[in-house]
Amino acid sequence: MSPETIGPAAVIVLAAGAGTRMKSRTPKILHEIGGRSMVGHALLAARAINPLKLALVVRHERDRVAEHVTASDPEALIVDQDDVPGTGRAVEVALKALDAEAELTGTVVVTYGDVPLLTGELLGELVATHEAEGNAVTVLTAVLDDATGYGRILRAENGTVTGIREHKDASEAERTIREVNSGIYAFDAAVLRTALEKVTTDNAQGEMYLTDVLGLARDAGGRVAAVVTEDRWQVEGANDRIQLSALAAEHNRRIIESWMRAGVTVVDPATTWIDSTVTLDEDVRLLPNTQLHGSTTVARDAVVGPDTTLTDVNVGEGAKVIRTHGSGSTIGAKASVGPFTYLRPGTVLGETGKIGAFYETKNVTIGRGSKLSHLGYAGDAEIGEDTNIGCGNITANYDGEKKHRTVIGSGVRTGSNTVFVAPVTVGDGAYSGAGAVIRKDVPAGALALSLAAQRNAEGWVAANRPGTASAKLAEAAQELASTSSQFQATIEEGKQA
């Protein structure tokens, strides 16, 4: 449905189950697939059909689930299921809560919080069919090769739906039926309300079954029909980690295929993972073993990978990111990062800049064209444009109690193994010598040197480490040097004679 289309009166998402087979302290519906919780996927699909109201029924880990849902969808109505078990009761308490302001009329959709591949498009098809045919109940079904464990859809000779038979109650003949109940429905609100008043817990499980509504609606003269989807993945739930993994893999496959159709090159889809929240431009190239998570964006002509994981990172046009682990960072157009680089949150690399091999950065802004090529750390710092930071440079930003900031200007050139002891500022165009320890501000255009003149203690090894391999090698080298000097002196004497 388009954003302008008014959707059903309400969507009810059932999310009260404990999910014990997941064997986790995290509620089942909060487990993630493709960068979004399963209930997050359910809410996204529900909102896609523009319901006037949306309710979520909770029970297990109630406060934790409610907090998560409210953070992403503050307008969703949180409804608590009481001690009466069953899907029928869950829908009944939700309907009463939705009716509190004014009694609902029209279509009510019921879906689940653990069906992460369900799309708004399929829900929209369910609603459209339900309303076009004037049905009392429309059930979403799928045809499975192996229907073991699922409720079977029973049909009359003319094809109309007559009921649902749970697997444990089905006859041998009924168990050959491959069309199964997804548990996702569109109801006429008035029919649903009336039928729920008649649903009891008088069954082997002692629960209020939502499936009982179909028979009650049919007995009251209502039409019960089905929408059959050929895409079984959209109605698959995740009850344990094995099913969760299978759904995650299928979800990822679909995301990757959609991006490839949109002009993205994925060299090895089998080793590439992309969250549903990631944005890619045309002509992006993803190399093997690349993972893109969160709000990551990658602009046109950028190359990411191999062996790269980015979370909430913005990659500019034409940039290259190789064997890098990064989060909360920005990489400018035509910039270069890696290999073996660690970008921590707050890293901003300007256009055409470079962060090279074995570098760690955190909370640092690096100007256009500046280079931090290898073996260093830059944290809590600001580096200007066209500055070259030498090998082995670090910003010593922590004094044991507080973090301090280093500011390095534009056009600066630093020698290898320079240490900046923050807080310190280096002016534009300044240089530092190799091994310098910068404890004071360096004026623009100055050369900073901090090492004393070199002094060689002749014979120290022989005196302090006699008999060692080093001492023996030093003695041999000294003898060779002495012989060479004598030979050279003889040659010079011959020239003078």
UniProtKB/Swiss-Prot annotation:
GO biological process: cell morphogenesis; cell wall organization; lipid A biosynthetic process; peptidoglycan biosynthetic process; regulation of cell shape; UDP-N-acetylglucosamine biosynthetic process
Family: In the N-terminal section; belongs to the N-acetylglucosamine-1-phosphate uridyltransferase family.
Source organism of the structure: Paenarthrobacter aurescens (strain TC1)
Protein name: Bifunctional protein GlmU
Reactions it catalyzes: alpha-D-glucosamine 1-phosphate + acetyl-CoA = N-acetyl-alpha-D-glucosamine 1-phosphate + CoA + H(+); N-acetyl-alpha-D-glucosamine 1-phosphate + UTP + H(+) = UDP-N-acetyl-alpha-D-glucosamine + diphosphate
Chief location: cytoplasm
Active site, renumbered: H374
Record-listed E.C. numbers: 2.7.7.23, 2.3.1.157
Cofactor: record remark: Binds 1 Mg(2+) ion per subunit.
